[in-house]
Amino acid sequence: MAFSTTALRRTLTTSALTAAIAVSPLLTAIAQAVTLNGAGATFPAPLYEKYISEFQKKNPDIKVNYQAIGSGGGIRQTIAGIIDFGGSDAAMTDSDIAKVSKGILLVPTAGGAVAVVYNLPGVSSLKLSQKSLAEIFAGRLAKWNDPKIAADNPGVNLPDQPIKTAVRADGSGTTFIFTNALSSMNSYFKGRVGVGTAPKWTTNPLKGRGNPGVAAQVKRTPYSIGYVEFAYAKKNGLQAAAIENKKGEFVLPSLETANKALSTVKFPDNFRVFEGNPSDGYPIVGLTWLLVYKQYDADKKAAMKKWINWVLTDGQELNDDLDYTRIPADTAQKAIAAFDAEVK
């Protein structure tokens, strides 16, 4: 029996409608999916990777990407407006914020220690006074058996070898934390090198891109010394020096000693803190921020709100496991309230 043309058309139309109805939930899901692209600091990258993995399990309609390119790169891309959020361990300055027409809210996410890592064959434990550490990176102390370093390490057979410093090749919030601490500790370093994300080093140093790059330089170079976020020191099995704090105690980096150092931090309304040489605990610590615009389209704003709220609540539960300090609960709630009030 042959179908009439009209019947055939009716059948095809019905089939097409049925197919459209069947796939419409998929199309709706695709239409509702939002991607948030971020870039910046390597200091919190291990933590942000974990954040993203856990966040997306609970929010499959939001895809978050984060490129660890360094704080300097994160700030530049934020100013250029080519990402949805940035990451930096150096709080943006007023002059940088003024370059962003959409405005910027700094959201603190974690704190942590910057470890001073070293590769000294035959030396399993190293102490460095604030003066010795600062003068090594300012170029004033050139050999490992310098009397000042020897005085920090009685009974240790220090090698008669040149000190090879390793620093960041890129603009870096980790470098900001490190140079801010050393400048607070020592006036010679402050005048010679100063505070910055990409200072002019005077030691002709080895250079590595990102925390992984500096860790790799130290790991493969005997008689070298560098600085990396504590998680990278642990991950790469690097030895960390005990650094003198204001109390005269030599302290190793750890979650406990970083928490002790950051426990007295007071967050102002703009959440920008520059902790130089804390009075207790491990003396080289800092915070890291998400750089959030104050204007988004409706879908991105809704996705950013979910992301920020999660990072400052459920996400904080992950900080301890990766040796990052948590943001105080009251400060986290203030940051959430600031997002709600200021982001349009």
Question: What is the predicted function of each stretch?
Answer:
Residues 1-10:
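N-terminal secretory signal peptides that target proteins for export/translocation
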